[in-house]
C-alpha cells in the first residue's frame, strides 16, 4: 500500500493508546498508518448519565459515519462500545487478542481495605454503568452509587480527590495506560460479569473494501473473536445496550469454554444468572441459547419492568 492507512479513533488517552496498538501491528506487516481523531457524542455530553442520553453508538457513530464516507480506511473501537448491529456497509473485520476483561475496584487511599466487603456502609462508589451499578447494589445494597463520567485519568483523579470513596473501572483500560497501581482488587467472574466484549479492541472496515479488509483480518485473534461473538449474541438476543444491566463473559476451560451471562434490574434487587457450555463452532447460537434460558428464568420480566420504567424502548415487531 502506497498511501498510509487512515485510522479513525476517539481522542481520549485510552483510545489513542488502543489505536497505536493497531498501528504497531500494521507496521509489523510493513504498513504505514496515520490517526484521525474524533470527539463523539459520549465524549461531549459528560454532564449526563449514559443511560439517559439514549442514542446508540455514543462513542462510535462519528467514526462510523466518516468510515462509510471513505474519509478513513478503518476505525478502532473498544468493542464493548460498538452496538451489536453494524451500520449498513460496515463490518468488524478483526478483534485483537483480548486484554483482561474483568472489572476492578479502585479505592481512595484513605480507605483501608482490599475488597468491596471492606467499604464502610454508605460509601460512595462511582460508575456510569447500569451494569456495574446493579451488580454493586446486588452485592452491597448499603452503598451509594455516584454517577462518574469522564476518561480514565479523570475518574482516577476523582477517586484520589475523595469525590467518591471508590470507583469501578475496566481492568483493560488501566492495564493499557500503565495504571496498575490504582487497582485494589479484581472483580472475578462469574460472581461479577463485565460488559460483552470488554477488553477487546475491534477493527471496523467497509465491507466492500478489498484493499483494507484482508489487512485488517490478518490482525484477528480467533479465540477472542469466538468469545466475543457469543457474548454479543447474548446481548443482542436480550435486546440489551447501555440502558440495560447485562453482563457476559466467555471463559476458556480445560475442555472447551463456558459462557456466563446475567441481567438485572437497575436497583440490583433482582439478578438472573446462567452458564452454558460454549459451542465454538456456533458461538452466536450459544449466546442465543443462554439468553433464552435466562428469559425463562425471569429475564423477560426484568426487561418488561425496564420498559415500564422507560429505561427501554418497546420491542420492535419482526
For each feature predicted by the language model, list its residue ranges.
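Short, well-ordered beta-strand segments
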Residues: 6-8, 75, 93, 126, ...
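Paired acidic/hydrophobic, glycine-rich loop segments that form the ligand-binding mouth/hinge
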Residues: 56, 73-77, 165-170
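Short acidic active-site motifs
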Residues: 62-63, 115, 154-155
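Small-molecule-sensing regulatory modules
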Residues: 2-39, 44-48, 52, 138, ...
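A conserved helix-loop-strand patch within extracytoplasmic ligand-binding domains
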Residues: 79-82, 88-142
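Short, structured active-site "lid" loops
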Residues: 47-74
Amino acid at each position: 500500500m502506497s498511501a498510509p492507512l487512515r485510522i479513525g479513533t476517539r481522542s481520549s488517552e485510552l483510545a489513542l493508546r488502543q489505536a497505536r496498538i493497531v498501528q504497531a501491528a500494521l507496521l509489523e506487516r510493513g504498513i504505514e498508518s496515520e490517526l484521525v481523531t474524533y470527539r463523539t457524542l459520549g465524549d461531549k455530553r459528560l454532564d449526563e448519565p449514559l443511560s439517559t442520553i439514549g442514542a446508540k453508538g455514543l462513542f462510535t457513530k462519528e467514526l462510523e459515519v466518516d468510515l462509510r464516507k471513505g474519509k478513513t480506511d478503518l476505525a478502532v473501537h473498544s468493542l464493548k462500545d460498538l452496538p451489536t448491529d453494524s451500520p449498513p456497509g460496515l463490518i468488524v473485520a478483526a478483534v485483537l487478542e483480548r486484554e483482561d476483561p474483568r472489572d476492578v475496584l479502585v479505592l481512595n487511599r484513605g480507605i483501608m481495605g482490599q475488597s468491596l466487603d471492606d467499604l464502610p456502609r454508605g460509601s460512595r462508589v462511582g460508575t456510569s454503568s447500569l451494569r456495574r451499578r446493579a451488580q454493586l447494589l446486588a452485592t452491597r445494597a448499603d452503598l451509594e452509587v455516584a454517577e462518574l463520567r469522564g476518561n480514565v485519568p479523570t475518574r482516577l483523579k476523582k477517586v484520589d480527590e475523595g469525590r467518591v470513596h471508590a470507583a469501578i473501572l475496566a481492568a483493560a483500560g488501566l492495564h493499557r495506560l500503565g495504571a496498575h497501581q490504582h487497582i485494589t482488587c479484581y472483580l472475578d467472574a462469574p460472581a461479577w460479569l463485565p460488559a460483552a466484549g470488554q477488553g477487546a479492541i475491534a477493527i471496523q472496515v467497509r465491507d466492500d473494501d478489498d484493499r483494507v479488509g484482508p489487512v485488517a483480518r490478518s490482525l484477528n485473534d480467533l479465540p477472542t473473536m469466538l468469545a466475543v461473538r457469543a457474548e454479543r449474541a447474548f446481548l443482542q438476543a436480550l435486546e440489551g445496550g447501555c440502558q440495560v444491566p447485562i453482563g457476559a463473559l466467555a471463559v476458556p476451560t480445560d475442555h472447551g469454554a463456558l459462557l456466563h451471562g446475567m441481567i438485572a434490574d437497575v436497583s440490583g434487587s433482582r439478578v438472573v444468572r446462567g452458564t452454558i457450555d460454549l459451542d465454538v463452532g456456533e458461538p452466536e447460537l450459544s449466546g442465543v441459547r443462554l439468553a433464552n434460558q435466562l428469559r425463562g428464568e425471569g429475564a423477560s420480566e426484568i426487561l418488561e419492568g425496564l420498559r415500564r420504567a422507560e429505561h427501554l424502548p418497546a420491542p420492535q415487531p419482526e
